[in-house]
Amino acid sequence: MSGWLRSRVRQWLPDAWMAAMRKQLRRARHWGLRHWCNACGSRLRAFLPHPSGEQDFLCPVCGSKPPHRLAMYFLQERAELFVGGGQMLHIAPEPGLRPRLATMCEQVGMAYRPGGLTGEGAEHLDLLDLPFADASVDLMYCCHVLNCMPDDRAAMREVRRVMSRQGTALLQVPAFHVGAETIETTTREQRIAAFNDDGIHRCYTDADYQQRLRASGFLVTVYRAEALPPGDVARLSLKREVLHVCQPDGPR
C-alpha cells in the first residue's frame, strides 16, 4: 500500500477500526496450533521472545505476558468472582487484558473500573488513596505495581479497606528473590544498581510478600502455574508464575 493510500485510509477509518484491523492482521500472521493466548483468544505458532532472550513470552497479538495469562486462567476458572451489581478494579490496566476483563464484567452486569496514575482511557486511581467507600470493591487485579511503590504496606492496607467482605484481590509481583530477605532500596542509586530501573523499589522473597499481605488484613492463597495441567502450562507458555489470591481476613 502506497504512503498516499495509507494516509487516506487512516483519514477515512476511525482509529478503533484501524486498531482492530491491525490486530486481525497480527492474528493471521502468527496463527498456529501450538499455543493459545487466553487474554485475546488467539491461536499461535509461538509467543514472541522477551527482550532478555527468554523464548515464548509475549503474545504477538495483544501483548500479554505469562503473569497475565496465569491471572486470566484463574479468573476464567472462577467465574463466580464476577458479581452482578458489583465492581472490579483493574489497576495499571494492561491493554491486552482490558477488553477481555471488560467483557467478562459486562456479561454479568459488573462495573469494570480500569485506572492508575497514568494511562489513556483510564481513571486516575492512586493505590494510596482510592476514591471508593469501605468494603465497596468485589474484585481487583493489580500486576507488578506493589514492588514499584515506596510504601507498599500502606497500599496493601488501602486495598484491604476497599475490598468487600467476600471480595478477592489478585496482587501479582515479579519473580521472587531466592535469598533470605527481600531486597529493599531507598535511593535512586540503589535502585539502578539492584534492578537497573529507577521505578522498582524492591524484590520480595515469597515468604515476606505473603507476610506483608497477611499483616495488612488478608487471607492469602498461592496459585502457582506449576500446579496446573502440563498441557495448559505449555499452551499458554507459563513459566514459574505465582498469583497471590487475597481475601479479607474477617470484618474491619
Identify what each model region corresponds to.
Residues 2-131, 224, 229-252:
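Conserved N-terminal segment of class I S-adenosyl-L-methionine
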Residues 23-31, 150-159, 164-252:
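S-adenosyl-L-methionine-dependent methyltransferase catalytic module, highlighting the catalytic core
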Residues 117, 142, 174-176:
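An acidic- and aromatic-residue-enriched active-site/binding cleft used to recognize and process polar
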Residues 143-148:
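Short catalytic micro-motifs in class I SAM-dependent methyltransferases
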Residues 91, 140-141:
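Hydrophobic beta-strand segment of the Class I
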